[in-house]
From Swiss-Prot:
Divalent cations such as magnesium or manganese. Coiled coil: none annotated. This is Malyl-CoA/beta-methylmalyl-CoA/citramalyl-CoA lyase. Substrate binds at H32, F33, K40, R92, A183, D184, L274. Homohexamer. Dimer of trimers. Pfam families: HpcH_HpaI. The keyword Metal-binding applies. Keywords: Carbon dioxide fixation, Lyase, Magnesium, Manganese, Metal-binding. Optimum pH is 7.1. Its EC number is 4.1.3.24, 4.1.3.25.
Length: 348
């Protein structure tokens, strides 16, 4: 069951901020994760914040159980001490069935709720998970006089979560979007891979036999094509954003870039970075190609109102390609506001 339309945007607690109706317009090409319990990494955060679109403190996977409270406290400490400027601030809390999650949310909202943009919830399986966090956040926001609503980002890591995507997307006006969690999702599905994202050398198609050909070529395929496309469809239909999650082979930058590029072309807004070397990869991939932007601008200039037909370099352009061009140019304009070098290259 969903709320009736006239109740959907009402605050869930007296004194909680009014829910938003549209997501903020801002670049989110790279969501950089950091472990807040590590002091030397916390010390670098003010500098890292200048390089990324989103910083996400990680309290869940990869944080040892005996360091959970230290990670939470470290996150609060670094947030209090840092001016993030126009960089968005997220936190991935522990799973909703864990002994830490209630304190994660309560203590972080109480201490730094007015600086926090998004809470990422791991292993979301259905709208009931979002409803719980939605109500809990509203009560905390009211208690601590938080000025703007904290949004919810759902991490897709189970087959049940994938089945319930539409219901999750429409569960609350707090919904920001989805991220793909390939390792846990692979385990949940029973996929036969130990890789965190990326392809697999045994997953592909074999070319038809050709006369005189000694070997039939084998073409490796993307394990995550269907999942990403489904996630993007549901997110966009609900006005949300879709993100490729982690790519685990930190040293294989070429494979990381290829996986990120597939996600970008399919409609994802951005991807996670787990190490500093993945930051420029994500920023490069999720910024539209300069030549694509320049060509898209020509389409918009030739068809100012999007109607009619134009021929550009021998290619027919119509209202459908005008819409495609507008997507590219709108993204380029948004990124240009944050990146002077790209602004110059795009001519914006």
């Amino acid at each position: 069951m969903r709320k009736l339309a006239h109740n959907f945007y009402k605050p869930l607690a007296i004194g909680a901020p009014e829910p938003i109706r549209e997501l903020p317009v801002r670049p989110e090409r790279v969501v950089h994760f950091f472990p807040p319990h590590v002091e030397k990494i916390r010390a670098r955060i003010p500098e890292v914040a200048k390089q990324v679109d989103v910083l996400c403190g990680n309290l869940e996977d990869a944080i040892p159980m005996d360091a959970k409270e230290a990670a939470r406290n470290g996150f609060i400490e670094v947030v209090k001490a840092t001016d993030f400027g126009d960089t968005a601030l997220w936190v991935r809390v522990n799973a909703l069935n864990s002994p830490w999650v209630l304190d994660d949310i309560a203590e972080i909202v109480a201490a730094v709720g007015n600086k926090l943009d998004v809470i990422m919830i791991p292993k979301v399986e259905g709208p009931w998970d979002i409803h719980f966090v939605d109500q809990y956040l509203a009560l905390l926001e009211a208690r601590h006089q938080i000025k703007k609503p904290i949004l919810i980002h759902a991490l897709l890591e189970t087959a049940q979560g994938m089945v319930n995507l539409e219901e999750i997307a429409g569960a609350s006006p707090r919904m920001h979007g989805f991220s793909l969690g390939p390792a846990d999702l692979a385990a949940s599905r029973g996929m036969k891979t130990t890789r965190v994202g990326g392809g697999h050398p045994f997953y592909g198609v074999l070319a038809d036999p050709q006369e005189g050909q000694a070997e039939r070529p084998f073409y490796q395929q993307d394990l995550w094509h269907y999942t990403i496309a489904r996630m993007v469809d549901v997110a966009v239909a609900h006005g949300l954003r879709a993100f490729y999650g982690p790519f685990g082979d930190i040293k294989d930058e070429a494979a990381c870039e290829a996986q990120f590029r597939n996600a970008f072309l399919l409609g994802c807004t951005g991807a996670w970075s787990l190490a500093p070397n993945q930051i420029p990869i994500a920023k490069r991939v999720f910024s539209p190609d300069v030549n694509e932007v320049l060509f898209a601008k020509r389409i918009l200039e030739a068809m100012p109102d999007g109607s009619g037909v134009a021929m550009i370099d021998g290619k027919m352009q119509d209202d459908a390609t005008w819409k495609q061009a507008k997507v590219i140019v709108d993204l380029a304009r948004m990124i240009a506001k944050k990146d002077p070098d790209l602004a110059q290259a795009y001519g914006l």
